[in-house]
Design a protein with these regions (language model features):
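A short beta-strand motif that forms the metal-chelation/ATP-contact edge
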Residues: 48-52, 109, 158-160, 225-238
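Anionic group-transfer/hydrolysis microenvironments
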Residues: 111, 150-151, 159, 218-220, ...
Length: 257
């Protein structure tokens, strides 16, 4: 099992490690031999039969591509979660997405990798602020980025394990858990009614297109019940539903062999 490097777990190091350890515990109870290692020290020597990986570092993903064993999440799928690539996939398969233009501000997100610090996801109140934020990213050497209009509605976080039936949704403003505080931008949840099964269907379809099994993301549910996906990630921490998620993830050993 490969832990995620701290640079790719902003404000979530302990939570990310906790879900991996929970899965490892279940695998050991099933009789599997499990070893845990850091992303920065990919083990040398005997090749395992199966890898559960939270790795995100480009060099590690490149190495994992040469392994001829099942890997969850697959390195190519994890690479596809870079926002520029992800946006292309979402557009191609028709995933509900926020518009590019609007009257309520914009979101600018680095496009070459998952967010590693607060400045990788920026809210801009207007076009002038957006231009300034883009220039700020360029000064940091980030040339790939995505822009979307802010969408009013309930922010809903979802978590899933493809092919297992596991899918859970939560309102982050209800429990106050946050990574960078951006969840507050949409305000307290109104708990608008929406079709959870439809959201799961869209999430599973996107997971298949991206090429990952363990996923999470964010969506906005509008007052009329329609929704759009605003984020999609490989292997989140599942901190709101860790025990259930660990059961589902551990079951992938049988499904993927």
């Amino acid at each position: 099992m490969i832990q995620r490097a701290e640079q790719f777990s902003p404000n979530s190091v302990e939570k990310d490690l906790a879900i991996l350890e929970a899965v490892a515990q279940r695998l050991r109870l099933q009789g599997h031999e499990v070893t845990m290692q850091s992303e920065a020290a990919l083990a040398q020597g005997r090749q395992p039969d199966f890898i559960f990986s939270m790795a995100r570092h480009p060099e590690i993903l490149a190495i994992l591509k040469f392994f001829s064993i099942p890997i969850v999440n697959a390195p190519a799928g994890t690479q596809n979660c870079a926002r520029s690539t992800l946006e292309t996939i979402m557009t191609r398969i028709g995933t509900p997405m926020p518009p590019r233009e609007g009257n309520d501000g914009y979101w600018l997100k680095r496009g070459d990798a998952a967010a590693q610090e607060r400045g990788d996801v920026v809210f801009a109140a207007d076009r002038a602020a957006l231009d300034a934020a883009i220039e700020g990213m360029r000064r940091r050497g980030i040339e790939k980025y995505v822009v979307s209009a802010h969408v009013k509605g309930d922010l809903v976080k979802f978590y899933g394990v493809a092919g297992t039936g596991f899918f859970r949704c939560f309102y982050p403003t209800d429990d106050g858990q946050t990574k960078f505080g951006d969840e507050q931008r949409n305000g307290a949840a109104h708990h608008y009614a929406y079709d959870v099964a439809s959201l799961q269907q869209e999430a599973e379809r996107l997971a298949a297109a991206v090429g990952i099994a363990v996923y999470g993301g964010d969506c906005i549910v509008r007052a009329d019940g329609s929704f759009c996906l605003i984020d999609f990630n490989d292997w989140p921490s599942f901190s709101r539903c860790r025990e259930e998620a660990a059961d589902a993830i551990a079951s992938l050993v049988k499904v993927r062999r």
